[in-house]
């Protein structure tokens, strides 16, 4: 029986580090990239007698997330100890939430192949992050433990098994990431581990009512790896079933170098963690007034912003989706459009440059919009140079690349690099006459109906003028000279 006769069933558990200045239960910094164990104290080191104190900002960010995702905010929630042993967990337990999480229900809506899909949520709960094992830190191959991350606040967002393909899982995660970034609760950086995703994957024969045995997949720090891991795991489980072998419930690790999953440990059930209420923390009471205040402060969310871009600015669903995928990029786009001009034509121009050339440059450098030397005003100035015929499209790309690298003003770059177009009809006409005289055969073919040769002539004229001829003037003169 081929894999097409099976249905893959996926649920995701997304761990999002919250953008607080300090950890969830102590005052240590959450800043990424410090020397190992620089941001630690008796609380996050798990020393005897050290007591946790809840960071209020964590509760507010959890409520903010829950409201944006349509969850029920529980007026009373409780922290619990999740007991397990691992070197990066100094207390021997993780403070999390179990029976009474802060948020329940909710959903995430995403678009795939032009259709909207919705995945329901089970819950959102608060918890502390663990530390990080660092291997081969010495010549003898010894491993170390960096506890800077221990105690960094997380929300875990748990979906129901509503996803039915690797592509759906990727689009769900993209939509959720965009929401978290728009809320300002998470930076969306999967490479640094501030947004992590585990996938629960099972397969069942199409038409069956009972779900198959699930395996949890870890170590996926990109959308590409999430897709690869789910697709491999689904194939692996189908092959086991077809061979008459059982699928064992377990936790598996994705190996990005080999593009496959491998067994990590047997999958634990809740009772294996011996959850019990955290005795050192009181219940979390969330008052209705706080919920309503946070509800009133919610920003425009990505789907609403994308719909506004399409409705008010005439952008395509594709362009709007690309812009709202990153809240910082969409805010930059709004500022650039305000600097350049209003209307659908202006919006399309700005969107093309933001999602095209600027996105390419940003991907090469890894810079966020806040660090771009191309400010919204500088992009607007570049586009005005194009509108005025001072530079063409290729010249504008050169200008933006230089501005992105140096922060120079666009008009100064045009002058320094000699990028200004020639619009003088006399100069262009001389080049046109020279090209037509050098290619009489092609000119006759054009006049005989081979109209596609116009591009050839334009290219030859631009070559003659070293790329500086105004394309509109070049085209007009060629058509006139060729008898159009």
Curated annotation (Swiss-Prot):
GO molecular function: asparaginyl-tRNA synthase (glutamine-hydrolyzing) activity; ATP binding; glutaminyl-tRNA synthase (glutamine-hydrolyzing) activity
GO biological process, one term: translation
EC number: 6.3.5.-
Reactions it catalyzes: L-glutamyl-tRNA(Gln) + L-glutamine + ATP + H2O = L-glutaminyl-tRNA(Gln) + L-glutamate + ADP + phosphate + H(+); L-aspartyl-tRNA(Asn) + L-glutamine + ATP + H2O = L-asparaginyl-tRNA(Asn) + L-glutamate + ADP + phosphate + 2 H(+)
Keyword Ligase appears in the UniProt entry: yes
Membrane-crossing residue ranges in chain numbering: none
Record keywords: ATP-binding, Ligase, Nucleotide-binding, Protein biosynthesis
Presence of keyword Transmembrane: no
Pfam families referenced in this protein's UniProt entry, alphabetically: GatB_N (PF02934), GatB_Yqey (PF02637)
Subunit and partners: Heterotrimer of A, B and C subunits.
Similarity field: Belongs to the GatB/GatE family. GatB subfamily.
Known role: Allows the formation of correctly charged Asn-tRNA(Asn) or Gln-tRNA(Gln) through the transamidation of misacylated Asp-tRNA(Asn) or Glu-tRNA(Gln) in organisms which lack either or both of asparaginyl-tRNA or glutaminyl-tRNA synthetases. The reaction takes place in the presence of glutamine and ATP through an activated phospho-Asp-tRNA(Asn) or phospho-Glu-tRNA(Gln).
HAMAP family, alphabetized: GatB (MF_00121)
Name the record gives this protein: Aspartyl/glutamyl-tRNA(Asn/Gln) amidotransferase subunit B
